């Protein structure tokens, strides 16, 4: 199984790895698109980048860092991304076998494996990044069907934990998706928004550490339930699971 996580806007700075080498990234079919997007992102003057990326003057260093994407140091992607989901995942305590089951969606790289070395960058899935010819394509238009095709080619069950914006960049037919819901006092259900990432991080950790390999949505549910999580199947869509918290 391959567990695809969402990226995070917040990222760890620095790194001790050599500068980015596209040939050291997984999913080589995405290389050309990655190179084009990176070149366009790196070409943005800082003041223009603030507007394009929708960030404030306070985050000017983020835009400045984008100007040196090919020379900045790298670190494994799973440690580059930070925030609520990644805190709950606690990748530093995961064994190599567990890390091999993890991938991450990305506006810049499409999808990468957890251990792929990447630099710090700023680019979100909702950005309209100018091309050299002045066009303003969406990230969805830039990626086309390439992310979907790359994930289909892994020939494994894909558990897609990406947020909606990143799922739109490359949906995967028959991928298992997860809704997080809480039970209200009156027994009704409410979709969890604030702690959604935290619970998905815990869910991903359980799957990554499983001694069993999941090949179906039912397998995923069984693994999660065995770890003490409350997971339900959707009778109308077997690939959609609900994590009840």
UniProtKB/Swiss-Prot annotation:
| One Pfam assignment | H2O2_YaaD
List, alphabetically, the GO terms of the cellular component aspect.
cytosol
- Which Gene Ontology biological process is one annotated for this entry? response to hydroperoxide
Question: Which HAMAP family does the entry mention?
Answer: UPF0246
Q: Which family does it belong to?
A: Belongs to the UPF0246 family.
**Protein name, entry field:** UPF0246 protein cgR_1824
């Amino acid at each position: 199984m391959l567990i695809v996580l969402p990226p995070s806007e917040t990222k760890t700075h620095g790194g001790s790895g050599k500068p980015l080498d596209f040939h050291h990234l997984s999913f080589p079919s995405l290389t050309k698109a990655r190179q084009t997007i990176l070149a366009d992102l790196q070409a943005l003057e800082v003041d223009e980048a603030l507007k394009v990326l929708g960030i404030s003057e306070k985050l000017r260093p983020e835009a400045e860092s984008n100007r040196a994407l090919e020379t900045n140091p790298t670190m494994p992607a799973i440690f580059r991304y930070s925030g609520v989901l990644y805190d709950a995942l606690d990748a530093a305590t995961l064994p190599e076998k567990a890390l091999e089951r993890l991938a991450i969606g990305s506006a810049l790289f499409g999808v990468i494996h957890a251990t792929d070395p990447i630099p710090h960058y700023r680019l979100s899935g909702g950005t309209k990044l100018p091309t050299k010819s002045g066009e303003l394509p969406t990230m969805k238009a830039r990626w086309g069907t390439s992310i979907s095709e790359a994930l289909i080619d892994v020939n494994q069950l894909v558990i897609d934990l990406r947020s909606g914006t990143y799922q739109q960049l490359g949906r995967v037919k028959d991928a298992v998706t997860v809704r997080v819901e809480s039970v209200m006092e009156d027994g009704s259900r409410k979709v969890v928004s604030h702690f959604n990432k935290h619970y998905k991080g815990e869910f991903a950790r359980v799957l990554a550490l499983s001694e069993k390999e999941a090949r179906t949505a039912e397998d995923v549910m069984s693994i999660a339930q065995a770890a003490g999580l409350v997971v339900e199947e959707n009778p109308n869509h077997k690939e959609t699971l609900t994590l009840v918290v």
